[in-house]
């Protein structure tokens, strides 16, 4: 059992950004294991998923949110509503801006959603995909962008979640923004997501990646049966894909 320090901190951090800017990959890197599915296809994340990071002096609950975008469908509208609801109850916000894409109207819209947040950081993601001089120019551009929309930013951190480059630094900077509090979850868990939900998400990830041309992106997976195989350390799972 870990003894918590007097100044132990705990709280929630929302990770937001446009679709496909590396939010889910970053959550997995921060937590240290895969709890969120990832895909090159937009809006793979449907529900806010909480990753729990427990350290001797803090516990951080990172909330992976669906990508914020101009909705064209009812699903898109509902995903945006989920993000707005989560922003109201977090202690800090991390905006993800990819190093290999231009800053656009979507990023401006997202930034304006958190103008009233006192603790905002920006992660310039996917730094492994650009050259050093391009990254330096992007960091300057991001700073100017934040100032232009009136966003007060505590830190701008370039990271590569894929290579886990500067993710430890980002984690420590986010931890500084948390309030003093005892841990909110048991220290031995890394997500509050039920095992069955994790399994359905992994199946959905495989379906999206392998059947993207054949099935709609709005597929839903349900578990029909899950039984532990006798004498083995794995389960037999029967699931249904609803399209």
Where are these predicted regions, by residue range?
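Conserved G1/Walker A P-loop phosphate-binding module
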Residues: 1-92, 97, 239-242
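Conserved C-terminal guanine-recognition region of P-loop GTPase G domains, centered on the G4
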Residues: 54-59, 78-154, 227-231
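Canonical P-loop GTPase G-domain recognition
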Residues: 118-121, 128-195
